[in-house]
A protein has these predicted regions:
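Radical SAM enzyme core and accessory elements
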Residues: 1-11, 54, 69, 382-537
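Flexible glycine/acidic-rich beta-alpha junction loops that bind and position SAM and/or redox cofactors
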Residues: 16-22, 111-114, 185, 235-236, ...
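Short, hinge-like loop/turn segments at secondary-structure boundaries
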Residues: 28, 73-75, 119-123, 140-141, ...
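Structural detector of well-ordered beta-strand residues that form the stable sheet scaffold
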Residues: 103, 123, 146-148, 259, ...
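Structural recognition of alpha->loop->beta junctions
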Residues: 114-133, 275-283, 343-356
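Radical SAM [4Fe-4S] cluster-binding motif and immediate context
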Residues: 158-324, 329-344
Length: 537
């Protein structure tokens, strides 16, 4: 690598084609951003390249890929998650048409390695495990190849600081960093343990603080998301890191606040919750999936059983962290009471933001292997028109298998949940209850956006969906009941600018699917298989 010849590398982040639950386009626009977060994977790969190689980044979620960009490049890197698959294929085709060698990598192609034969190079698995081989092959003049990393063997303590200097910070709601990879649990539907293993590998404390120092040096201030799939998967490591993070924050006058994802057993560890509080963590995503213990056991998510889930969420609130939660409908063991039980849990726990989706059998998971063995998995179909499914995401692409309950019953339950959970009054009510439950919120808040707070508040309220008066009144009541939590309540309220309209779009889409299941309608499986082909990439 030391003697590598100069090479112009164009990193192209593929576009999330569909409107997804996490798009938050209206929220981003309200605060002057264009997209939620930058491509941490690509800028990490950029840091692994030889110093002699020049690197540029084009994120198609915020800007267009131009002819000048491609003219400059000697080599193009692209890829991403399954939901970016259609655009990644378009990028590969464009590069091949322009005679530009292109490499594709990331979790999408790793899960479905045969999905993109047109790419010159396919990089499968964690890039650190094969990047030296790739560079050597390129330097030797090779222009085709497949490079596959040995699973779960990458030493993340040797991963360099991502190339944060390639980012345009103001274009994003927040930036991401990663402390660890892997999760110790065995959820049947999850692909994380297939991609990164069940033994979480963590970076060192100095290494992680160096990444934050670089962001600070580059002038970034504000929200940072730890993108770990389970930050507390290695409790020993994270408990050693958080006190050091708290010291760093104090020494730098609290430039950042953090969110992350963690398993619900976080609520069982008061010490860990207080460490996160002192390290300026303000929110956490928790996968709840189902309120039914039998369903949780069947999906191998036993960590969510033997507990009162609402009380566990309230314990996290008491430590000053709000909770976003994930729920899934469509499991084999569900009963006709599944929908009402899910809504009741969401209301009792007072979780405003709930990602409720249809079960989808992701490539290379325990669930997919079981359904395939049982003869219930719908076969993937190659989609010739890649843009024919714009607007579909995990909320509408699910159930790519034969359900045990009648399909129309599962879909009707899904509509019922979304209508109740994202009714404006219900959402506002959960905000009010959350404001009373959030404690320990009196912490330093970083300032980032140039627009004045009053101006931003007016912009947000002007863009809230109807009934605006309800949300204005709710914000006033929340601020009166818990002034220290008012800013966080405002953030969660702002998200309804996207979640309200998005839920109504999903409801309309699912109701059309139910109509197609009526006697004399077209075969429903064909509809779902056309949609599922995007995720099969």
């Amino acid at each position: 690598m030391v003697n590598a010849q100069p090479c112009n590398v164009l990193m192209v982040c593929s576009r999330f084609e569909a409107e997804t639950f996490w798009s938050f386009k209206k929220t981003s626009a309200a605060v002057g951003a264009k997209h939620t977060s930058p491509p941490l994977g690509l800028i990490t790969v950029a840091a692994l390249l030889p110093p002699a190689w020049s690197v540029r980044l084009v994120d198609r979620n915020i800007e267009e890929l131009t002819d000048d960009d491609l003219d400059w490049a000697d080599l193009v890197f692209t890829g991403g998650m399954l939901s970016q698959g259609a655009d990644a294929l378009d990028i590969v085709d464009l590069c091949r048409a322009r005679g530009k060698p292109v490499a594709i990598g990331g979790p999408g192609i790793t899960s479905s390695p045969h999905a993109c034969p047109a790419a010159n190079f396919r990089v499968l698995g964690e890039a650190e495990g094969v990047i030296d081989q790739f560079i050597e092959a390129w330097e030797a003049g090779e222009r085709e190849g497949v490079f596959e990393a040995e699973k779960f063997k990458v030493d993340v303590t040797k991963t360099p600081i991502p190339r944060f200097d390639l980012l345009k910070f103001d274009d994003y709601l927040h930036v991401g960093v990663q402390f660890s990879r892997g999760c110790p649990f065995t959820c049947e539907f999850c692909d994380i343990i297939e991609l990164y293993g069940r033994v979480p590998r963590a970076k060192t404390n100095p290494q992680m603080l160096a990444e934050l120092e670089e962001l600070y040096r580059l002038g970034y201030r504000g929200h940072i998301d730890f993108v770990d799939d389970n930050l507390i998967g290695n409790k020993k490591a994270v408990k050693a890191f958080l006190p050091e993070l708290a010291k760093w924050l104090e020494a730098h006058d609290y430039p950042f606040e953090f969110t992350t994802e963690a398993s619900i057993n976080l609520a069982d560890d008061h010490e860990l919750l207080m460490l996160m509080n002192r390290a300026n963590f303000v929110g956490v995503f928790v996968g709840i999936e189902s309120p039914d213990p039998a369903t949780l056991v069947a999906m191998r998510k036993k960590q969510n059983t033997r507990r009162n889930i609402a009380e566990s969420i309230h314990t996290i609130y008491a430590a000053g962290l709000f909770v976003h939660a994930g729920f899934i409908i469509g499991f084999d063991s569900e009963t006709q009471s599944a929908a009402d039980a899910m809504v009741e849990l969401i209301e009792e726990a007072a979780i405003p933001v709930c990602m409720v989706g249809l079960l989808y059998a992701l490539p290379n998971t325990q669930l997919t292997r079981r359904l395939e063995k049982e003869g219930r998995l719908h076969p993937p179909h190659e989609r010739k028109d890649r843009h024919g499914i714009v607007g579909a995401d995990q909320c509408t692409l699910g159930l790519n298998f034969e359900t045990l309950r009648p399909r129309e019953e599962v879909l009707a339950d899904y509509v019922h949940i979304l209508k109740r959970v994202y009714d404006p009054a219900a959402y506002a009510g959960r905000l009010l209850r959350l404001a009373k439950l959030l404690a320990n919120c009196s912490r330093r808040q970083p300032s980032r956006r140039s627009a004045g707070k009053r101006e931003m508040l007016h912009r947000i309220m002007a863009n809230m969906p109807e009934p605006r008066e309800l949300f204005g009144r709710t914000l006033t009541q929340c601020a009166a009941s818990n002034p220290a939590a008012a800013r966080r309540i405002l953030i969660l309220m702002t998200l309804y600018m996207d979640l309200g309209p998005f839920s109504r779009d999903v409801i309309a889409h699912i109701e059309n699917m139910i109509a197609e299941l009526a006697p004399g309608a077209i075969e429903p499986r064909a509809h779902l298989e056309r949609a599922s082909s995007t995720l099969a990439m």
